[in-house]
A protein has these predicted regions:
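A residue-level marker of the well-folded mature domains of exported/periplasmic proteins
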Residues: 1-245
Length: 245
């Protein structure tokens, strides 16, 4: 029986035949590129910016793509000393968040803010891999940070986070239209039912420990205050009432 892993890859199982997901490396790249543009890092000169990091569950293979994709963009600025992490918490396992939990993200950032930013040090940017962790960061900032609001990334366009984008409490989120993923998965199932090859566009990236799994990667999109209306409301993904409730 063919098995299609949906969005999250099943690891260490030879039962998985195909994988339908988003281009998770590109999710991280988009977050990194947003930070570069928002801070104009290419023209930073001798300026330095303080950055902190948070990603998701250490058992979720996707964090490797989200986090590493973003770091691939930011690394030159880290190496040049333009981006500095006052907490020193930079390793993926250190900045991971069990179960992607908002309360755990909030608790960790409240500790970071108290330990490294309570003296007036400016926090310039937080690379958050997704919206549930970004929400925890935003909650921590609201409760215990008095500096200029940092650039804050996210992913998923959860309703609470889109509200934060509108309110200026989150800079961006990467939109992964689940309608696209569902539609592509249906195509894959239909092909298998007909005895034909399902659509795939990646045969190199996703190794679940038993081999590379043929995958279809849907395209993620940046969501900001400038395009959320078109991307989320006009497309029918959310209604105005969803965001005003």
């Amino acid at each position: 029986i063919p098995v299609i892993a949906y969005d999250r890859l099943i690891m260490n199982s030879d039962a998985v035949c195909y994988y339908a997901t988003f281009d998770n490396w590109d999710v991280g790249v988009k977050q990194g590129e947003y930070i570069v543009d928002a801070l104009d890092l290419e023209n930073a000169g001798d300026k330095t910016y303080n950055i902190e990091y948070i990603t998701g569950d250490p058992g979720d293979n996707n964090i490797n793509f989200f986090f590493d994709g973003a770091i691939s963009v930011l690394q030159p600025y880290i190496d040049a000393g333009t981006l500095v992490c006052p907490s020193g918490q930079t390793e993926k396992q250190t900045v991971a968040t069990a179960n992607w939990a908002t309360d755990a993200a909030q608790a960790r950032f409240e500790n970071i803010l108290a330990s490294y930013y309570s003296d007036g040090t400016q926090l310039d940017v937080v690379l958050a891999s997704n919206d549930s962790t970004a929400l925890g960061v935003a909650n921590a900032l609201a409760s215990s940070y008095t500096g200029n609001y940092p650039v804050l990334t996210g992913q998923d366009c959860d309703i609470a986070n889109v509200k934060n984008i509108v309110a200026g409490k989150q800079s961006m989120s990467v939109f992964k239209d689940t309608r696209d993923l569902a539609s592509k998965t249906v195509e894959m199932v239909d092909a298998l039912m007909k005895g034909t090859e399902p659509p795939v566009n990646d045969t190199e990236t996703y190794d679940n420990g038993t081999g590379v799994i043929p995958s279809y990667l849907c395209e993620p999109k940046d969501c900001t205050i400038d395009n959320y209306q078109e991307l989320l409301i006009d497309s029918g993904y959310y209604t105005e009432a969803d965001l005003n409730g």
